[in-house]
C-alpha cells in the first residue's frame, strides 16, 4: 500500500521517473548521489527507496538517533555514526558496513547544498576501505529523472576512477538549483 502511494505521488503527481536500479544481489555499496543542491533531494531519495523497495541508508551523528527521533531515522534507513575512541568518520562508517549484511549508503560528495569547487573524497575512501562498489545516482531536475548507474568497482586511483568511471554519469545533469551544483 505504501509503495503504491509513493509511486502515485512520485510518478503521477510529481512527474518523475526512475531509470535503472540497484541489483537485489548487491547488498552493500556506496551510492554517490549528485547533484545535491536542495533539501528536496532527501525526499527524492526517500521516494526512490520506497518505490524500489530496497534498503538504502544514510548516516548521522549518534546524537540524532536518540528518543524521540531515533526510531524514525532508523526506520527510513538512518545509521548512527559512533566516533568514540578517536575514530574518524571513514573508519566509523566502514565499521557499519562490516557489521551489517545489507548496507547501501547514499552520500552526496558535495557535502553541502551550496556551490563547491571540489568534491569531498570520503565516499570514495569508504568504498575502498569497505571493499564495496560505488553506484552513481543522478537527481536530474531538468528531465525529472533519478538515474541509477551500474555499480563501479574502484581501483584506488581516485582521479582515474572519478574521471573515467564515475563523473561521466553526471554529464548534463541539472540540479534543482543549477548555480549551486558541482561542475568539474
List each language-model region with its residue ranges.
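Non-catalytic C-terminal accessory region of glycerolipid acyltransferases
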Residues: 86-184
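Short acidic-hydrophobic, aromatic-tinged amphipathic segments that line or gate anion-handling sites
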Residues: 18, 79-84, 153-155
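Short, glycine/polar-rich helix-capping loops at beta-to-alpha or helix-loop-helix junctions
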Residues: 3-6, 65-69, 136-137
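Short glycine/serine/threonine/alanine-rich loop segments
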Residues: 16, 54, 78, 131-132
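Catalytic core of membrane glycerolipid acyltransferases/transacylases, capturing the structured
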Residues: 24-84, 141
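Helix-to-loop junction immediately C-terminal to a conserved catalytic motif
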Residues: 3-36
